[in-house]
Regions:
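Cyclic nucleotide signaling catalytic output domains
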Residues: 251-280, 286-311
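Conserved nucleotide-binding and Mg2+-coordinating catalytic segments in signaling enzymes
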Residues: 130-149, 169-183, 191
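Alpha4 helix (beta4-alpha4-beta5 surface) of REC/receiver domains from two-component response regulators
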Residues: 62, 75, 85-101
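A short pre-motif secondary-structure segment
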Residues: 204-207, 246
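Short amphipathic alpha-helix used as the core "switch/output" element in two-component signaling
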Residues: 61-74, 230
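Hydrophobic framework residues that shape the active-site pocket
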Residues: 174, 193, 208, 213, ...
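Two-component/phosphorelay signaling modules centered on CheY-like receiver
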Residues: 8-29
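Short regulatory alpha-helical coupling segments
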Residues: 130-131, 144-163, 194-201
Length: 312
């Protein structure tokens, strides 16, 4: 387990590092709280923070609150506050500000090691729970709820200087694949598509449900179309052999964030563009600015939604 240790005294840092069993944990020592925060923000491998109450720049209590806010609910971090005083008010304050444990300073060696073993167990369990709660088990991509949580934040942070585009796509004739080759083959398709997407982009990628996926990319419309084309070709190149050889294609709709857009609005335009790709031959990319979003598109899309439980 990687541990961020914060204390203004280098002597205390060295002594604490020596107390921790070598080989079981890696200690990153800091004299200032802000430097520790920067490390935690940049390194997802840090799973524990041990801090003294008195620091050179901010207090240990402030560091607790800032670190807890930084990692949020999507990353495990076990926080231990240590102090040489027996001030129970300080214990309460630390726990109320995000600490998980409180220990005397200097700690008894066996007590410190036992608490770190507990922290290791808890953060590993939390990591698994977070994974199960935020990812789609079949594809390894973000699940619908987590995707929309991240997408809303991305839309709120978008502006003319930081473009954002949505690439919405689904598997062509996926129901036929399940009906013809069986659901095991359908699952294999979804797993392979997830693997393609994880290597194709560093954007926000989620499975919205069934055979529908979305990628939010920090780029303008033209670049997003290029990304979509690259993904389309990669998916088209996939080959499956069970129970007999077959391939798949996907249809893509691309839309760029516009001032005042919510995630629902940008996905609506991408959705209509994707239906246009379906309606004009499948296995293609359609950008939302390449055709007028007329009432006819809305009417056709509404009919398709009503008459077909699954897109083809």
């Amino acid at each position: 387990m990687r541990i961020a240790l914060v204390d203004p005294s280098r002597a205390i840092q060295r002594a604490m590092t020596e107390l921790i069993v070598p080989g079981e944990h890696e200690v990153l020592a800091f004299s200032e709280g802000q430097k520790a925060l920067n490390c935690i923000g940049a390194d997802d491998g840090v799973r524990a923070l041990i801090t003294s109450v008195q620091l050179a720049d901010i207090s240990g209590i402030q560091l607790c609150a800032a670190a807890r806010k930084l990692v949020g609910s999507r990353r495990p971090l076990f926080i231990i506050v240590m102090s040489s005083t027996n001030d129970y008010g300080l214990v309460v304050q630390a726990l109320d500000n995000g600490a998980d444990d409180f220990i005397r300073k200097p700690p008894f060696p066996e007590e410190l090691r036992a608490r770190l073993r507990a922290a290791d167990r808890l953060t590993l369990m939390q990591r698994d729970l977070i994974k199960y709660a935020t990812t789609d088990s079949l594809t390894g991509l973000l699940n619908r709820r987590t995707f929309f949580d991240d997408a809303v934040k991305a839309c709120n942070g978008a502006d003319s200087a930081s473009p954002l585009s949505a690439i919405l796509f689904d598997i062509d004739q996926f129901k036929r694949i399940n009906d013809t080759y069986g659901h095991q083959a359908g699952d294999a398709v979804l797993e392979s598509l997830g693997a393609v997407m994880r290597t194709a982009s560093s954007g926000i990628i989620g499975r919205l449900g069934g055979e529908e996926f979305c990628l939010l990319q920090s780029c303008d419309l033209a670049d997003a179309v290029e990304v979509a084309e690259s993904v389309r070709r990669s998916i088209r190149a996939l080959r499956f052999t069970q129970p007999e050889p077959f391939g798949i294609t996907c249809s893509f709709g691309v839309a760029e964030w516009e001032r005042g857009d919510t995630i629902d609005r940008i996905l609506r335009r991408a959705d209509i563009a994707m239906y246009e790709a379906k309606n004009t031959g499948r296995d293609r990319v359609v950008a939302s600015d390449t055709f007028a979003l007329t009432d006819q598109h809305e009417k056709w899309r509404g009919i398709a939604r009503t008459t077909s439980p699954r897109r083809q």
